[in-house]
Amino acid sequence: MRPAIKVGLSTASVYPLRAEAAFEYADRLGYDGVELMVWGESVSQDIDAVRKLSRRYRVPVLSVHAPCLLISQRVWGANPILKLDRSVRAAEQLGAQTVVVHPPFRWQRRYAEGFSDQVAALEAASTVMVAVENMFPFRADRFFGAGQSRERMRKRGGGPGPAISAFAPSYDPLDGNHAHYTLDLSHTATAGTDSLDMARRMGPGLVHLHLCDGSGLPADEHLVPGRGTQPTAEVCQMLAGSGFVGHVVLEVSTSSARSANERESMLAESLQFARTHLLR
């Protein structure tokens, strides 16, 4: 019998609360672990502090998200090459299986030119998997407003339409020919990408899922799974029925929650969705 797929909670899912809140929710609700989003919060950058939280709440760190967002360009320095190296070291120190990283930005030329080789070298020297995540372009239809942009995507049958990609070689990590990938279901919604097809194309290289949802808006939504238009249940069922040996992490936005109870309800609903559709 294949082992159950572990389900984690991203520390980004409790924003604007701090990382400790994610450990607390994960413990209380029954998540199997957390994904550490390294960004502006000082604790997220302090591996010793994160290790203490993990021990205090008895919640392991399953994965580390490298500080590669636009808002975290100065976290752990300004050199993205060194930041990725440090992310892998952090994962090793925390006992995490995976580092999630975005494709390089186009203006990070030196980093972009050596990215594939760096990822391969890091994996060759470590047991940590570096899973490159699918992203999305800047869509021109965002200027038409939410309703119209969603309808335009529906009418064209998916795809971003006229758009500009900030990523090299593209926002599709499969263009980089890496060994391991992260599939994010909010990003597929924003890009108009067929997420089931992308999961199949990633094949055994798919080792990490950001379980969330989206409705086709040009902005990244990170909805609770089941509240958007993505085939979230089908993707989970595909993984459950396969030889998937990675982790599934809920990376959902709860910043709209009007109370602590509402945030907890969103996180509990997300976990229940995952448990239901990942059952083996």
Curated annotation (Swiss-Prot):
Keyword vocabulary terms for this entry: Signal
Ranges in a coiled coil: none
Keyword Signal: yes
Keyword Signal: yes
Signal peptide limits: 1-21
Family in the record: To M.leprae ML2432 and S.coelicolor SCO3347.
The protein's name in its UniProt record: Uncharacterized protein Mb0509
Organism taxonomic ancestry: Bacteria, Bacillati, Actinomycetota, Actinomycetes, Mycobacteriales
